[in-house]
């Protein structure tokens, strides 16, 4: 299959210095709203990249569950590969691919764990079957078959049919605290727009345009 000639022209918008806000989170909020309003499937999906102790990177897609001036929040099993790697090396990068809008956002930073109360607030907001799934799956561990997983899920569902589940101690959230955020808008003839925010030690953000 020949793929070297697969390409398309980008023409849906531009990104100029007049679009810059003092905080990158204001621009991110607007872009996220645009993605949601456009009906893009899974607009909160982001790829999170981590690195293990040997320097080997790995990536996976998770869902953004909160964003504020503090950073970007996601939740996971604390025994998962990503959580284990973040416990050794908290440096992380995430990426939002809004292809329909011809936009991307790239974030670099470090993670911090959420508090017990923050974890509980989100856990209890989830549908009960999602809560059960957190218990049924020992994320990233081998399992003999899908049937075994479904059996474990059903056993838990029967056990907790009439009672609430406690917040699992092996599950929780991370906040990506960024020091760099890049906004990318596809442009005609591959002359894309790239605006990068960088955070100084005093907490203020500066911006610069990058060549495509």
UniProtKB/Swiss-Prot annotation:
Gene Ontology biological-process entries: pyridoxine biosynthetic process
PROSITE patterns cross-referenced by the UniProt entry: PYRIDOX_OXIDASE
Residues annotated for substrate binding in this entry: 7-10, 65, 122, 126, 130, 190-192
UniProtKB keywords: Flavoprotein, FMN, Oxidoreductase, Pyridoxine biosynthesis
MF terms in GO: FMN binding; pyridoxamine phosphate oxidase activity
Binding site for FMN: 60-65, 75-76, 81-82, 104, 139-140, 184, 194
Keyword Metal-binding: no
Record field: catalytic activity: pyridoxamine 5'-phosphate + O2 + H2O = pyridoxal 5'-phosphate + H2O2 + NH4(+); pyridoxine 5'-phosphate + O2 = pyridoxal 5'-phosphate + H2O2
Pathway(s) this gene product operates in, as recorded in its UniProt entry: Cofactor metabolism; pyridoxal 5'-phosphate salvage; pyridoxal 5'-phosphate from pyridoxamine 5'-phosphate: step 1/1; Cofactor metabolism; pyridoxal 5'-phosphate salvage; pyridoxal 5'-phosphate from pyridoxine 5'-phosphate: step 1/1
Alphabetical list of InterPro entries matching this protein: Pyridox_Oxase, Pyridox_Oxase_CS, Pyridox_Oxase_N, Pyridoxamine_oxidase_dimer_C, Split_barrel_FMN-bd
Annotated EC: 1.4.3.5
Record text on cofactor binding: Binds 1 FMN per subunit.
EC class: oxidoreductase
Names of required cofactors: FMN
Family indicated by similarity: Belongs to the pyridoxamine 5'-phosphate oxidase family.
Protein's job: Catalyzes the oxidation of either pyridoxine 5'-phosphate (PNP) or pyridoxamine 5'-phosphate (PMP) into pyridoxal 5'-phosphate (PLP).
HAMAP family, alphabetized: PdxH
Name this protein carries in UniProt: Pyridoxine/pyridoxamine 5'-phosphate oxidase
Lineage: Bacteria, Pseudomonadati, Pseudomonadota, Gammaproteobacteria, Alteromonadales
């Amino acid at each position: 299959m020949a793929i070297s000639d697969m390409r398309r022209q980008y023409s849906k918008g531009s990104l100029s210095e007049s679009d810059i806000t003092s905080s990158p989170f204001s621009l991110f909020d607007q872009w996220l709203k645009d993605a949601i309003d456009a009906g893009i499937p899974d607009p909160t999906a982001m790829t999170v990249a981590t690195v293990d102790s040997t320097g080997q990177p790995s990536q996976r897609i998770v869902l953004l569950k909160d964003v504020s001036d503090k950073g970007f929040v996601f939740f996971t099993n604390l025994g998962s590969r990503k959580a284990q790697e973040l416990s050794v090396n908290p440096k992380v990068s995430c990426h939002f691919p809004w292809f329909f809008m011809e936009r991307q956002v790239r974030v670099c930073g470090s993670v911090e764990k959420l508090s017990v109360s923050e974890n509980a607030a989100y856990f209890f907001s989830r549908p009960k079957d999602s809560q059960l799934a957190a218990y049924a799956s020992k994320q990233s561990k081998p399992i003999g078959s899908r049937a075994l997983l479904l059996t474990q899920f059903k056993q838990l569902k029967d056990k907790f049919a009439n009672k609430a589940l406690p917040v699992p101690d092996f599950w929780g959230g991370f906040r990506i605290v960024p020091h760099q955020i890049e906004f990318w808008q596809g442009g005609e003839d591959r002359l894309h727009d790239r605006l990068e925010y960088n955070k100084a030690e005093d907490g203020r953000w500066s911006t610069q345009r990058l060549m495509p």
